[in-house]
Structures are given as structure tokens and as C-alpha cells.
Amino acid sequence: MGGISIWQLLIIVAIVVLLFGTKKLRTLGSDLGESVKGFKKAMAEEPKDAEFKSLDKAENTAQTKKEEKEKEQA
């Protein structure tokens, strides 16, 4: 009673196709697919960037501590 049957879904799809047309729906689908692909690519690249940034920060910290020790010894 509370669920949506297959016939109701088919009627909704038919109305959407009549309102927007197949060409507009096709471009909308391809745009959505490209957006998802770009998002996945960005998410895959982000941890690499974060790892490099943390390594650079660690190297800078180590270099700074080394320079401070050299100044204290001099």
C-alpha cells in the first residue's frame, strides 16, 4: 500500500520523457556521469597530495631543528 509499484514508476518515467525529451535527458545523464567521474578522480588524488604535504612539513621541521642545534653549538 505504501510502496511504489513498477507501473507507477513507468508512468513517472513516461511523463519525465514527455516533459524534457530524450535529447535533454541524454545530455543530463552524460553531464552527471562526467561529474561523478571528476569527483572520483579528485577524491583519489587528494590523499596523495595530503601525504606529500605532511612529508614536506616533516622535512621542514627536521631541517629547522637541525639549524637551531647548529646555531646553539656555534
UniProtKB/Swiss-Prot annotation:
Q: Keyword Protein transport on this protein?
A: yes
Q: Name one Pfam family in it.
A: TatA_B_E
* One cellular component term from this protein's GO annotations in UniProt: TAT protein transport complex
Q: According to the lineage, what is the superkingdom?
A: Bacteria
Q: Which UniProt keywords apply?
A: Cell inner membrane, Cell membrane, Membrane, Protein transport, Translocation, Transmembrane, Transmembrane helix, Transport
Which compartments does it reside in? Cell inner membrane
Family annotation (InterPro entries): TatA/B/E (IPR003369), TatA/E (IPR006312)
Transmembrane ranges, per UniProt, are 1-21
One Gene Ontology BP term is:
protein transport by the Tat complex
* Region listing for Disordered, in residue ranges: 45-74
Subunit structure, as described in the record: The Tat system comprises two distinct complexes: a TatABC complex, containing multiple copies of TatA, TatB and TatC subunits, and a separate TatA complex, containing only TatA subunits. Substrates initially bind to the TatABC complex, which probably triggers association of the separate TatA complex to form the active translocon.
- State the protein's purpose: Part of the twin-arginine translocation (Tat) system that transports large folded proteins containing a characteristic twin-arginine motif in their signal peptide across membranes. TatA could form the protein-conducting channel of the Tat system.
- Record family assignment: Belongs to the TatA/E family.
Q: Which NCBIfam families match?
A: PRK01833.1, tatAE
Enumerate the PANTHER family for this protein.
SEC-INDEPENDENT PROTEIN TRANSLOCASE PROTEIN TATA (PTHR42982:SF1)
Q: What is this protein called?
A: Sec-independent protein translocase protein TatA
